[in-house]
């Protein structure tokens, strides 16, 4: 079972990275990990880190959870930035923003790596799926199919071929798929809209009406019936969580209800073990925790707030442990990780990250023993042992130039998935 941060599929786990991709343009890809259920039968677990290289081929590194060692490095395309596993699949897909490709390989077999070509100019920044048969790729750039907007490309996993490319809005940054209806939702930060895509078409279903101001991320509920859209508002006050009934075409493009969030919310994470939704209020230095098992647009509120946790400065990522005891919050402003009780929602301790870490992503393994942080600034992955909340290793990323032996610039970790 793969550990991704939003449910239903893996969007971009580069939780709100600020990355420069070609022509000086900046994009903030959003990803949502899906938390694996606990009690996994595997005896060996791994974390896979995607490493970004603006000047050449990126890579994935494979970290052995039990030994805290880098056991494999695989070369990807230029500007590797996001990764995802299809449902019940051993194949890992990596989006390469710099050369308009997606890499696919089976980590347990150590390759070979297959390169899937997208349309030139696509600049893929996120990918994910709630299916086994298809992978959805979010493209931020203009291509021949969509010369004035972003797009979403569909890869058929059986043939590793692109079957369609459909236009979405401007500067798309996040996507989520309903496992019940199959509808895919794309957040377009450039024009403040959310596009709805029906893979069965394939066709666009239009945009969601009734949205709050400035949508930034999307997450699917455990059963796939609901899509949660985080909106920031004007940035100075509370944001909102807009709830969409994704179970039928009739309600798929309309906000059914909204609940209030903290200041400057950015990302949301679903925890399938406790059936909770966590939202990072980046501007308010807090995390809102909701009961996602009890969604009813007719109620007020439409989804009960269980509690609010005070954390560090500018939280941008959350990973709940699979055993349900704790959740870990990545704080970019204070350069640390806050450990929070999943019962009392009180902060237990803060784990300081290396100086200059510039952390961008956080994940935990299915055994609840390790937490992983992608440190873009120091080009390493920090490993936190959850039994005592201490750092056990800082594993460096590969060099930007293959074979470099002296004064070597390193690639930048961007995203992590575990199993």
Tell me what each language-model feature is:
Residues 1-11:
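Bacterial N-terminal signal peptides that target proteins for export
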């Amino acid at each position: 079972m793969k550990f991704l941060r939003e449910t239903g599929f893996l969007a971009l786990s580069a939780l709100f990275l600020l990355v420069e991709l070609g022509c000086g343009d900046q994009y903030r890809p959003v990803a949502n990990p899906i938390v694996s259920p606990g009690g996994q039968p595997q005896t060996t677990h791994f974390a896979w880190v995607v490493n970004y290289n603006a000047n050449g081929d990126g890579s994935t590194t494979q970290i052995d959870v039990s030994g805290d060692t880098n056991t494999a490095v695989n070369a990807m395309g230029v500007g590797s930035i996001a990764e995802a596993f299809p449902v019940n699949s051993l194949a890992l897909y990596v989006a390469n923003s710099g050369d308009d490709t997606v890499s696919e390989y089976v980590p347990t077999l150590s390759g070979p790596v297959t390169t899937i070509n997208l349309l030139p100019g696509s600049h893929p920044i996120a990918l994910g799926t709630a299916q086994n048969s298809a992978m959805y790729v979010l493209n931020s750039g203009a291509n021949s199919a969509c010369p004035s907007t972003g797009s979403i490309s569909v890869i058929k996993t059986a043939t590793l071929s692109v079957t369609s490319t459909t236009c979405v809005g401007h500067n798309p940054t996040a996507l989520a798929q309903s496992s019940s209806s199959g509808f895919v939702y794309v957040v377009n930060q450039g024009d403040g809209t959310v596009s709805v895509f029906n893979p069965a078409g394939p066709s666009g279903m239009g945009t969601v009406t009734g949205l709050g101001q400035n949508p930034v991320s999307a997450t699917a509920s455990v059963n796939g019936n609901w899509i949660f859209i985080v909106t920031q508002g004007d940035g100075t006050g509370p944001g909102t969580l807009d709830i969409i009934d994704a179970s039928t075409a009739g309600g798929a493009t309309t906000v059914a209800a909204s609940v209030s969030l903290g200041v400057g919310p950015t990302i949301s994470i679903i925890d399938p073990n406790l059936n909770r939704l966590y939202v990072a209020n980046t501007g308010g230095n807090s995390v809102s925790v909701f009961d996602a098992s009890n969604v009813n647009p007719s109620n007020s509120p439409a989804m009960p707030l269980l509690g609010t946790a005070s954390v560090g400065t500018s939280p941008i990522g959350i990973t709940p442990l699979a055993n349900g005891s704790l959740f870990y919050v990545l704080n970019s402003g204070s350069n640390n990780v806050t450990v929070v009780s999943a019962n009392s929602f009180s902060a237990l301790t803060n784990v300081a990250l290396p100086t200059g870490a510039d952390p961008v992503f956080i994940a935990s393994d299915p055994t609840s023993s390790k937490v992983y942080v992608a440190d873009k600034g120091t080009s390493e992955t920090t490993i936190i042992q959850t039994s005592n909340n201490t750092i056990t290793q800082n594993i460096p990323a590969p060099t930007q130039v293959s074979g470099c032996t002296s004064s070597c610039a390193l690639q930048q970790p961007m995203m992590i998935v575990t199993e």
